[in-house]
Each structure stands twice: as structure tokens, then as C-alpha cells.
Amino acid sequence: MILKDLLIEGYGVLKKASIGSYQIDAQLLLGKVLKKDRLFILTNPDYHIKEEEKEKYFQLIDLRKNKMPIKYILGTTEFMGLNFNIKKGVLIPRPDTEILVETVLEEIKNKNYKQICDVCCGSGIIGITIGYTLNNTEIICYDIEDIPYNTTKENILKHNLQDRVKALKSDLLTEAIKEKRRFDLIVSNPPYIREDVIETLMDDVKKYEPFEALCGGKDGLFFYEGIIKQSLEVLNDGGTIAFEIGYDQKIQVSHILNEYGFKDVLCIKDLAGKDRVIKARKY
């Protein structure tokens, strides 16, 4: 069988399954099987496909047909121009999180912060992007779950950042408190979706992405309060705390920050004009 014919079959299966991105997904999956980039797939229609390659391709097509996210199948994703390993068990990075990273990068540069903490780090994209961009920082990425912890370690090695980025296991900031660490900036994209909203999410999210990385408790605020409360013991005076938030959580998260004595609370909107990032300072 030639590449063009196999690709057309893949298109048909995914289109029938109502996968909106059926063409690009089929191309990327074939590229994964052949270990070729998408340009090769698009410019070599007569390339001969072996039987075992065909079988492997349709195994992957079947996963996508059943709504497994394409990035889990590929095992990689891009974030702010960097490539990261991801797998089932870690949240798939969203473009919205780039607003958070851009905000904290500016904060770190403006205030000459050195000691940075990424809590609920998932695949490590926030801490690693900071470390990759700013080589005069020291970053600790915390997560309590094995898969995120190990994935973050893989991504640190992938970008050769072992000298300034570390992954450690911790329930929020518990280990940082035990070890009496101090940070200039704490950043987090914690689970923040309300429990009752999870069931309304798209199939590829609620069926495959980890519940514990999505659900922020009954009101969506559980992790914000936990991190903010613990941060008082490890965040330096004059330090900054920054979060990604849900579009409707500005008032509640601002209230928690104020309750714990944080000042200069500022909310930043995303490109769609929705509240997306909140930051505040400890005095």
C-alpha cells in the first residue's frame, strides 16, 4: 500500500468519528509510525508502507477514534516553542497557560528574582520554560503524583536543565515547609474546575485527562486556598505569588489572597478578554 491511500483511509475513519481535526491528526499519527515529520507525509504520496506499519497506524487511528487526545498518542506537545514529553496521567498544556508564564517571566526579570517554585507542576512546563528562558534562576517543581513527577524529570533532562531545575514530590508546599526553603516567586496552574462541571467537559478531556489534575473541589478553590496558606511559610517578603484561574474565579481568589494578607492583587486577561491570571505580593 502507498502512503496516500493509507492516509485517505485514516481520514475516513476519523471523520466518521466526528474528529474535527481528522486530517492533521491522521497525518501526525502516520508520521509517528514512520518516524517522519509532517512535511514528509505531505510530500511523499507514493511512499511504500509496510504491512506492520499499516497495522500500527490503524492501532493509533483507533485510539484517536475513541477520543484519546492526539497529544497523548503522540507523547509530545509544544509549549512556548519548546517540546515536552507528556503522557496519560498529566494534564495536556493549554495555550492559556502561556499568559501565566509570560506574566511571571516579566515579574522575575523586573524584580530580579532568583528562587522560583512551580507547584502542581504536571509535566513541568512552567518551571522548565522559566529555567530555559532565564539562566540565572533556580527552580523547584513540586507534584504529589508519580506520573507528573517522573514526566517533569524527563523534561528537565530533555532540555538539559538539571543545573537549575529540580523535580521533587510534595503535597503542595508541605516538603518546602519541612525543608525550610525560601522562594522569591511561587507560580501554579492548580486544578480549578468545580466538581460538578467535570461531567460537562468534552469526552477527550473527561475520559482521558486525570481527574486529580482537573478538579479543584466542590467550589474549584481548594488548591488556591491550600497553596496561598502554605506560601506564607516559604515565600520571601516582597515575593510574588501567581496563579492561572478560571474565567469566573477572579473575585473568589482575590478574596483568599486578601484574607491571607497579600497586597497588590492584579488580574490579567487572556487573548479572549477573560480573566486568566492573578498575581499578588507578600509584604
UniProtKB/Swiss-Prot annotation:
The residues the record assigns to binding S-adenosyl-L-methionine are: D143, N189
* EC number from the UniProt entry: 2.1.1.297
One MF annotation (Gene Ontology) recorded for this entry? nucleic acid binding
Pfam families for this protein: MTS, PrmC_N
Give, as one word, the top-level EC class: transferase
Which residues participate in substrate binding?
N189, P190, P191, Y192
GO biological process entries: methylation; translational termination
Q: Which domain of life is it from?
A: Bacteria
The record's section on NCBIfam families has: hemK_fam, RF_mod_PrmC
**What does the function comment of this entry state?**
Methylates the class 1 translation termination release factors RF1/PrfA and RF2/PrfB on the glutamine residue of the universally conserved GGQ motif.
What name has this protein been given in UniProt?
A: Release factor glutamine methyltransferase
User: Which organism's genome codes for this protein?
Assistant: Clostridium botulinum (strain Hall / ATCC 3502 / NCTC 13319 / Type A)
